[in-house]
């Protein structure tokens, strides 16, 4: 729940710009109607390597109309991603069980989509075995920067995936 002591988005963007902005910025949208304000701040801080995700479907369609980089979601509950053709990527989530495999990732990459996988520890599960699998898939598909992982352990991930 946001409150008056939360870091303001503009302050976050200022901080982000002090780091390597070649890294993708995933913006998890939790309220409707933020498009105009967000677009202005992204342009002001010249942030281009980002994507928005997790908003309601009606709100997502407005983000698409405003030419944002929008990811759709695929999970064990959302087997067919919404607005797939209009999305630039797929946020792949495994809430309770491991279902993401090489063929699913390959399908999205062949369709020209970026892919971001939610790492298992974000759902209180062990991550090591799945990271091994994703590393193998990444090498086999030569996915490069088109395949990303969202993790609570970015330093461990950098060391593991880029050794």
Q: For each of these PLM feature ranges, what is it?
A:
Residues 42, 63, 108-109:
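A generic structural signal for well-ordered alpha-helical segments
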Residues 1-4, 61-68, 85-94:
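Acidic/glycine-enriched edge-of-secondary-structure segments
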Residues 1-33, 40-43, 47-52, 56, ...:
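An active-site metal/cofactor-coordinating segment within enzyme catalytic domains
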Residues 58-61, 124:
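Short gly/pro/ser/thr-enriched loop/turn and capping motifs at secondary-structure boundaries
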Residues 32-35, 58, 154-155:
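Alpha-helix N-cap/helix-start and coil->helix boundary motif
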Residues 38, 63, 157-160:
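Hydrophobic packing residues within well-ordered alpha-helices of enzyme cores
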């Amino acid at each position: 729940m946001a409150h008056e002591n939360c870091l303001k988005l503009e302050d976050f963007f200022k901080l982000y710009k002090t780091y390597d902005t070649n890294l993708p910025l995933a913006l998890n949208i939790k309220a409707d109607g933020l498009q105009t304000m967000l677009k202005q701040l992204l342009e002001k801080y010249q942030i281009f390597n980002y994507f928005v995700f997790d908003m309601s479907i009606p709100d997502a369609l407005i983000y698409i109309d405003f030419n944002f980089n929008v990811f759709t979601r695929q999970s064990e509950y959302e087997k067919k991603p919404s607005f797939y053709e209009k999305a630039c990527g797929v946020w792949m989530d495994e809430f309770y069980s491991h279902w993401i495999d090489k063929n699913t990732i390959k399908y999205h990459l062949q369709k020209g989509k970026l892919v971001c996988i939610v790492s298992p520890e974000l759902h209180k599960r062990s991550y090591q075995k799945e990271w091994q699998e994703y590393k193998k898939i990444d090498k086999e598909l030569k996915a490069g920067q088109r395949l990303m992982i969202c993790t609570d352990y970015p330093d461990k991930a950098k060391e593991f995936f880029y050794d």
